[in-house]
Amino acid sequence: FTKGMQQMITSGCILMLAWTIGGVCRDLLSTPVFVKTFIETTGLPGALLPALVFILAAFLSFATGTSWGTFGILIPIIIPVAQSICPELLLSSLAATLAGSVFGDHCSPISDTTILSSAGAGVNHLTHVSTQMIYALTVAGCSLIGYLIIGITNGNLLLSLGTSIFILCIFTFIMHRRSKTILNKKDICSTQ
C-alpha cells in the first residue's frame, strides 16, 4: 500500500507541476494568444492544426519523457487556439494532443514507463526502445495522415479514421509479404 501511495504522490506532483506550467503559459505568458497570432500571421491554414498539434505533442513528450506533463502544458494552450482559429477542429486537436503525447512518451528513452518495461522484461533498455520505435512510428505515421485528413475535411471523422486504418492495413500487408520474401530467400540460401 505504501509503495503504491509513493508512486501516486510522484505522479500527482508531476501532474500538479505540469498544470502550473500550463497555467503560467496560458495566463502570464499569453501563449494561446501568441500561438494564434503566429498561425494567423504566417498564413498557416487552420486545417493543419490537428497535425501540427500531434507533431508538437509527440516531440514535447519525447523530450520530457512524460505524457501527463505534456497534457498539462499543451491542453490549456490548444483549447483557446483551436476555438479561435477553427472551432470545428477543437476535439480533433485535443485528440491529437493526447495521441501525440502518448506516442512520444511511449518512444522516449527517458520515460518512466519505458524504463520500467525494459527492466520488467529483463532486456537492454536501448534495445527495447528501438524495437518499440518501429511499431510506434508506423502507427504515428498513419495517425498523422488521419489528422491531416480530418483537418482538410473540417472534421470528417469517418473518412479520417477509415483512411488511417486502410493505410495501416496496406502497410502491414506489404511488410508481411516483404518479410516472407526475405525469409524464403534465407531458406533457399541455407539449403544450398
Please provide the spans of the model-predicted regions.
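Juxtamembrane and boundary regions of transmembrane helices in multi-pass small-molecule transporters
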Residues: 99-189
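Alpha-helical transmembrane segments of multi-pass membrane proteins
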Residues: 47-61, 86-106, 131, 137
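Short helix-coil transition sites and intra-membrane helix breaks within transmembrane domains
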Residues: 9-10, 23-30, 60-72, 102-111
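Transmembrane helix-loop junctions in multi-pass membrane proteins
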Residues: 23-35, 63-65, 143-157
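Short amphipathic alpha-helical coupling elements at transmembrane boundaries
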Residues: 2-7, 33-41, 115-119, 126-130
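Membrane-interfacial loop-to-helix junctions in multi-pass transporters
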Residues: 5-12, 39-55, 82-93, 157-158
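Core transmembrane alpha-helical segments of multi-pass membrane transporters/permeases
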Residues: 1-30, 47-59
